[in-house]
Amino acid sequence: MAKYLFEANYTQEGLKGVASAGGSARRDAIESMISALGGTVEAFYFAQGESDVVLILDLPDNKTVAAISLATGGAGAITNMKTRVLLTPEEIDEAAKTAVDYRPPGS
């Protein structure tokens, strides 16, 4: 499984839903959704500043990430979703050992 960082902002309707049901209920709903897709929630935080919610998820593959983005983004409760693949230091160690035949443009 791969780790992903998700950040998003709630729309006005999304904020109303969080205020009505509570933060714990939102976390539980996300954990249930991710579990049903074969993943786990490592971290779930509400944030102040650039993002309203920040999650670290373990997910099976990029197809699952796309499905989550389509479903959650299409529901109208969140906006400005950003997804990043997270790499461990050991994964970077392995990447550094991988030979890459790259030539810059014009060389």
Residue ranges of each PLM-predicted region?
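A compositional/biophysical signature of low hydrophobicity enriched in polar/charged and small residues
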Residues: 1-107
